[in-house]
A protein has these predicted regions:
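Hydrophilic extracytoplasmic domains
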Residues: 241-332
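Hydrophobic/aromatic beta-strand positions that recur at structurally equivalent sites within the blades
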Residues: 60-63, 95-98, 135-137, 180, ...
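Sec-dependent bacterial lipoprotein signal peptides
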Residues: 1-21
Length: 332
């Protein structure tokens, strides 16, 4: 019995010592330091794909800081050219005008909100139980409701509803794109991006030149005249008219055509990418340990730079900038 106990203690010690040793990315050569371009008024506290909140309540959009303050304990959901979309601690949807005026709009829903967006008089909401709804901004009346499968577990990177003229694209928590006509209030089509059991919500969507690209954590879809799907373990994705670039959990940068045809791949052992952007003729991959990897679009050449960044910094991708902590760097 004593021997068994000793063996168990030894095995446990070995297990924990093995788990505590984490491999990290170490570049073979660093070209130099990528200097900070400027500072924010406070550190980043919340991030979404479209905007971020600072510790002092100020809003950070892709264009930079705005003279808008969001109340403490509110959760940032989304931001567009007209509205800053938030959730209050009581579960209400609260819209703040993007121009900084005081004419806020409150929807007393008393429900947990996963994602939301606003266009003209249409407010599109995805609730955390995967229910989709359309409301009138002016009257606050419910115009449309559609239920879906309640997810077991989701990725924190939840994509907001997307407006395409009169169409509303709900990006569900179970890996589907549900297309609703906002005028007729009818579901026109449902497209499956991925069918994994866990963490299957859509994390990204963009439409360029009538080609739709959407992804979950495990799959990417391209939809134009035809549908194409490919499986990747996706950390970050960037999409332009020239192609798609993916940073994977395996430390790879992968280049695809807009229709998902494979073009190139470059692997960086143990790299944990936290941001990806395509600017001009370069692909910029931000690595968690404080490195900027600048690659040519064909991934045949690259340079690595040091960045003054901590591994636990919250990251926000702006227009030609990476924001982290209370500062930013330019990549244009």
């Amino acid at each position: 019995m004593k021997l068994s106990t000793t063996a168990l203690v030894l095995a446990t010690a070995l297990l924990f010592s093995g788990c505590s040793h984490k491999e990290v990315y170490k570049p073979e050569e660093v070209k130099g330091e990528w200097r900070n371009a400027g500072h924010l008024s406070a550190s980043i506290s919340q991030t979404t794909h479209s905007a971020a909140l600072l510790d002092n309540g100020r809003l950070l959009t892709k264009d930079g800081e705005k003279n808008i303050k969001i109340p403490e304990e509110y959760r940032l959901v989304n931001a567009n050219d007209s509205w800053v979309i938030t959730e209050s601690p009581e579960g209400n949807l609260v819209l703040f005008p993007e121009d900084g005026t005081d004419a806020k709009v409150t929807f007393e829903l008393k429900r947990h909100i996963a994602a939301a967006n606003v266009q003209d008089d249409t407010v599109a909401i995805l609730f955390t139980n995967n229910e989709m709804a359309l409301y009138s901004l002016e009257s606050k009346k419910l115009l449309f409701k559609e239920s879906a499968n309640t997810p077991i577990a989701v990725d924190a990177r939840i994509a907001n509803p997307y407006f395409l003229k009169e169409l509303v694209l709900f990006l569900t928590l179970d890996g589907k794109i549900v297309i609703v006509n906002s005028e007729t209030k009818q579901v026109l089509r449902s497209v499956v991006v991925s069918s994994e059991e866990y963490f299957n919500n859509i994390t990204y969507l963009n439409v360029i030149d009538n080609n739709l690209v959407a992804s979950t954590g495990t799959s990417v879809l391209a939809l134009s005249q035809k549908e194409a799907r490919e499986k990747y373990e996706i950390r970050n994705i960037a999409y332009t008219a020239e192609g798609i670039w993916i940073a994977t959990k395996q430390g790879e940068i992968i280049a695809l055509s807009p229709s998902l045809q494979f073009k190139a791949k470059k692997k960086f052992p143990f790299a944990h990418f936290v941001g990806l952007s395509v600017q001009n003729d370069r692909v910029y991959a931000l690595e968690q340990e404080g490195y900027m990897i600048a690659l040519t679009k064909n991934l045949l050449a690259y340079d690595v730079y040091d960045i003054d960044m901590d591994s636990d910094n919250k990251i926000f991708l702006g227009d030609g900038r990476f924001y982290f902590d209370d500062r930013y760097i330019n990549i244009k």
